[in-house]
Amino acid sequence: ANFTHEWLDNLDRILEGRKPDYLIVQHMEPDHAANVANFLKVYPETTIVANAKTFTMIQNFFGLDLEGQKLEVTNGGTLNLGNHNLTFVFAPMVHWPEVMVTYDSTDKVLFSADGFGKFGALDVEEDWDDEARRYFIGIVGKYGPQVQKLLKVAAGLDIQIICPLHGPVLTENLGHYIGLYDTWSSYTPETEGIVIAYTSVYGHTKAAVELLADKLRSKGCPKVVVYDLARDDMSQALSDAFRYSKLVLATTT
């Protein structure tokens, strides 16, 4: 409820008394779209722009049929706003079936939905790669082929700004971020190294893992990372399993 008021208050302040003509809904997951109905209570004349799957979800989530105030777009469809021309690109399963991204050819902005997002707070200085990797692997990781299709479309666009639904707006070194997404979604290891992930009931498997890790390090393995899956951060273990070139699983019988 608090976020609802904060979001609507922010819109009111930015609009300065104007009424929005359109609300573009790219992704229906509730952390993004939960306030569509509340938005329409404040701005009932706004046209909702979305694809067919999204409109079905809006009906199912909120009981809204939006008759007379919806604009259904197709893959590759455009919307001319006067100074801005928007192109809609469907990105199913990145990471829900209705997802689409929007490209503004005037400002050369890609509104990338959950793509290029990351965990963390904007007021905390931290490396983008680590939290973006953990976010990608945990949420989008199994949809690599779908991400690859989206990247092929993005390669044909002049993108100068990426605006994801999670994390910071990206304005510099975009090739680095796009390159990492290509690596992650093609399941190509980033770094030579070994992740050892284990569970141990009585400590014997743990002892074997520690012995293995010591031997690998003594043989010059560039990076050995060990995770106790009963105690360590599972999302970090999963992220590193994709990051490094080799994975060893040790478990009780």
Regions found by a protein language model. Name each.
Residues N173-T253:
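N-terminal beta1-alpha1-beta2 submodule of the flavodoxin-like/Rossmannoid cofactor-binding fold
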Residues A1-L23, T46:
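Pre-active-site segment of Zn-dependent metallo-hydrolases
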Residues Y43-T47, I159:
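A short helix->loop->beta-strand "cap" motif at the edges of active sites that frequently abuts
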Residues A50-E172:
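Metallo-beta-lactamase
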Residues D21, Q160, S245-K246:
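Conserved acidic residues
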Residues E29-D31, F55, L229-S235:
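Short acidic loop-to-helix transition motifs that present clustered carboxylates
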Residues W7, K19-K41:
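Di-metal (Zn2+ and/or Mg2+/Mn2+) metal-binding site signature of metallo-dependent hydrolases
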